Amino acid sequence: VREALESNGIGVNTLTAVCSRGGNIIACPHGAIGIDQEMIDYLTRPEDTAKHASLLGSMIAFDLKKEFGIPACIYDAIGTDEMQAVARVSGVPEIPRYTVGHTLNTRAMAIKCADEVLKKPFDECTFIVAHMGGGSSIRLYHNGVNIDCVNDDEGNFSPERGGAVGCKDLVNYCFTSGNDAKTVMKKFHGAGGLKAHLSTTDAIEVEKMIDAGNEYAKVVYEAMAYGIAKDIA
């Protein structure tokens, strides 16, 4: 971070505030949230939060805050959850639905579209926004609030995620595969999707496979696009 700032002519000691990507703070509102020791303690407890690169942002920002005595915050954390009550209900009472994932990107794109394309305030618009990365999620924003979503582990597969599968098949796999919970989680969250089918998460490489005549790669790639389109619909 220091090298990046200095290479762009910005001295670290000239910062007046620092804002980072937010970690997996469960059920927080959108927007800016101040970073303090309690937040850092929560984000570093393995039983409370999943390991994710976004955790590093708050820790780096907190270090800069302490060193220079400046305000530090996270923004649109991946744990942002504003889902309406009716969307939280699942068919298994012990497992309610919730929002987690790509708030920072999807909300920014919705705000940008409202401002630059529709010329309307974001809080007067309704958007369906698709984030398509290593994991993919779909967000429904209504009047500035993310009222529903398709999380990256409950919709279609993506470059790294296994996506939704039949519950009977999943339960059977968990109890007959001989794998522990950590291994099964990795199969669905990190080693699934394109990675599992084609041994790569790079869509450019997949397109090269298709151009070279790999029919299986073509079917898998089209299946991913088809599934994401269904999630949007």
Language model regions located:
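Short acidic/polar capping segments at secondary-structure boundaries
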Residues: 77-82, 133-136
